[in-house]
């Protein structure tokens, strides 16, 4: 009489860890396969999920310059190193990305400086 999948699973569930390891090794030898490849493939989506949860690079996006446009232009020049005309064009073109791929601390610092100058800023 052939065993069903449930019978096999129940038998494996009752085995000790050492017996399961020995069973896996015997199956690898018998069928010429490796269980390690299946584990690596199964682990990949979990790594992607962790990367989504812990974002490491941020873009500082200027939504609007607010009332104090001149102060915002000065801060943009300080953050980006742009010339006066380029910084003014960036501020006038809001919403626009001020700086890309910053660490969380640097992005928060830039956001704080811009908000203190009167701008509305978003981190993406």
From Swiss-Prot:
Region entry Disordered, spans: 101-124
One record GO biological process: translation
Protein name (database record): Large ribosomal subunit protein bL12
Record's keyword terms, sorted: Ribonucleoprotein, Ribosomal protein
One Pfam match: Ribosomal_L12_N
Signal peptide: none
Origin superkingdom: Bacteria
Amino acid composition bias (Basic and acidic residues), ranges on this chain: 101-115
Family designation: Belongs to the bacterial ribosomal protein bL12 family.
InterPro entries in the record: Ribosomal_bL12, Ribosomal_bL12_C, Ribosomal_bL12_C/ClpS-like, Ribosomal_bL12_oligo, Ribosomal_bL12_oligo_N_sf
One Gene Ontology term, aspect cellular component: cytosolic large ribosomal subunit
Keyword Ribosomal protein recorded: yes
Entry function: Forms part of the ribosomal stalk which helps the ribosome interact with GTP-bound translation factors. Is thus essential for accurate translation.
GO MF term list: mRNA binding; structural constituent of ribosome
PANTHER family according to UniProt: 39S RIBOSOMAL PROTEIN L12, LARGE RIBOSOMAL SUBUNIT PROTEIN BL12M
Native species: Hahella chejuensis (strain KCTC 2396)
Assembly notes: Homodimer. Part of the ribosomal stalk of the 50S ribosomal subunit. Forms a multimeric L10(L12)X complex, where L10 forms an elongated spine to which 2 to 4 L12 dimers bind in a sequential fashion. Binds GTP-bound translation factors.
């Amino acid at each position: 009489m052939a065993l069903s999948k449930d019978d096999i699973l129940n038998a494996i569930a009752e085995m000790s860890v050492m017996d399961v390891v020995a069973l896996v090794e015997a199956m690898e030898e018998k069928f010429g396969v490796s269980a390690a490849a299946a584990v690596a493939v199964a682990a990949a989506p979990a790594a992607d999920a962790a990367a989504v949860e812990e974002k490491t690079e941020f873009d500082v996006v200027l939504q609007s310059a607010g009332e104090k446009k001149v102060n915002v232009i000065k801060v943009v020049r300080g953050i980006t190193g742009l010339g006066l005309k380029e910084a003014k064009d960036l501020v006038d073109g809001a919403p626009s990305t001020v700086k890309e791929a910053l660490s969380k601390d640097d992005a928060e610092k830039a956001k704080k400086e811009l908000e203190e100058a009167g701008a509305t800023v978003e981190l993406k």
